[in-house]
Amino acid sequence: MTTGLPSQTQVIELLGGEFARAGYEIEDVVIDHRARPPRITVVADGDTTLDLDTIAVLSRSASSLLDSLDNIGDSYVLEVSSPGIDRPLTSEKHFRRARGRKVELTLADGSQLTGRIGALQSGSLDLVVRAGREWKVREIPLAEVEKAVVQVEFSPPNPAELELATTGRAAGTEVEA
């Protein structure tokens, strides 16, 4: 049985330009033909936070574009969402977008680090870590990062730690290579 739904590639091609004009890119499209009604899930991300108002605007645009297809067929449910906080950071753009966020890294040698994401440059990541009572920047090659997951924080970060992550410098700290 065919549902008349477009393919993943067709959805990306149809919606990609509209999402790009809004400052977002489509990270994934999942089409579930078994759901009743069938479900099209579009996961988008960008350099600015994907808030509920933006999701509503993107959803309306996506729905209009999808509804304009001749072969869309039966009804469907459209979901537009962000990747979510538990999505592993897998590309340089993910790390860039998460600057200032607390992250847990697993490195190629099996060691784990928890710190705050700082600047990215030339295939490496500045990670702000606690060193005793101070904060220091450790440069971590992205090639050595096996897994990186943003951590949920329920309290505001230490101001010195956050300043170091966002500006790359703070009083009383040093850069460690």
Swiss-Prot record:
Protein name according to UniProt: Ribosome maturation factor RimP
Lineage, highest ranks first: Bacteria, Bacillati, Actinomycetota, Actinomycetes, Mycobacteriales
One Gene Ontology biological process: translation
SUPFAM superfamilies in the record: YhbC-like, C-terminal domain, YhbC-like, N-terminal domain
Any Gene Ontology CC annotation: cytosol
Alphabetical UniProt keywords: Cytoplasm, Ribosome biogenesis
InterPro entries registered for this protein in UniProt: Ribosome_maturation_RimP, RimP_C, RimP_C_sf, RimP_N, RimP_N_sf
Family, similarity comment: Belongs to the RimP family.
Function summary: Required for maturation of 30S ribosomal subunits.
Species per Swiss-Prot/TrEMBL record: Mycobacterium marinum (strain ATCC BAA-535 / M)
Cellular compartment(s): Cytoplasm
Gene: rimP
